[in-house]
Amino acid sequence: MDQPTDLRGGGALPVTAPHPLDNAVTAPHPLDNAVWAALTGPHAHLAERLGRAARYPADVYAFAALADPADPAAWADLHALAGPGTTVRVKPVDDVPDGWEVVGAGRGVQLVDTALRAEPAPEAVRLGPADVPEILDLVARTRPGPFLARTVELGTYLGIRHHGRLVALAGERLRLPGWTEISAVCTDPEHRGRGLATRLVRAVAAGIRARGDVPFLHAAADNTPAIRLYRSLGFTLRRSSRIVVLRTPGTPAARTGVAPHDTLSEVAPDGSGTPWTEVTA
């Protein structure tokens, strides 16, 4: 079983108030099951839920979650929710029940803000539904991870434009009590090396902190350059976990089309299905 990393060893910073991680080692923490905490918390209005299993709509974020990955009843609920012969992404998962086929697997790391300099970026603009075609184009060229037609509904997304063209992006994905994930960090290859990604990460973090939340993020466990960048910005490695793409037991019912939840064929270590590539600040 994966365990959180104690962040306070080796010369801790002075503490004037309890930090959200104070009980991370001794008690279950929302970040240990972040997708479930989001779907049963601030993102409950987006959840497709059955008992102890839940998932996001297929065009929002292609992940499902279990209240307790060690609970057979939660797996039974996920099977009923997803249906037979369907592929689902789930994290974190250590052991998969008999009858569930592992289609793909990888490891990701979770990092939390402990010393990030958060500040607005005057050149950043807020992005909305009208900007989704441009966002999808940038994401397709830079491959920061999944971004779907309605992902923008998860939180605030900021972008930087050059001569009117979107060249950099970052925003909020998972939101759970006290915590918000920074995601979709990417920069057009022609505009890297200018610090655009760093400015957007700090700007998104400023908005997260303004409402009293702590920023966190995920990266592929083997993406050393990305992890190095995030740590240099003030994020601390908290934990590593396993992400899986599974096919549920049974034969799918006949249908005329293939639902987006059924189109997954592989999973990167960050759970995105594609490698996280933006590492240039």
Residue ranges of predicted features:
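N-terminal charged segments
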Residues: M1-V96
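Short amphipathic alpha-helix that is part of the acyltransferase structural core
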Residues: D2-D32, Q110, T114-G145, T251, ...
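A short, internal acetyl-CoA/4′-phosphopantetheine-binding micro-motif in the GNAT/acyltransferase core
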Residues: A64-D68, V185-R192, A220
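Conserved acetyl-CoA-binding loop-helix of GNAT-fold acetyltransferases
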Residues: A73-L78, G193-I208, I227-S232
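Conserved beta-strand-loop-alpha-helix junction that forms the acyl-donor binding cleft
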Residues: R89-D94, G207, F216-I227, I243-G250
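Conserved active-site alpha-helix within GNAT-family acetyltransferase domains
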Residues: D95-W100, T198, A221-R239
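Conserved catalytic-core motifs of GNAT/GCN5-like acyltransferases
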Residues: E101-D113, H218, T236-G250, A281
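A conserved beta-strand-loop-helix scaffold within acyl/acetyltransferase catalytic domains
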Residues: P146-T156, I160-T187
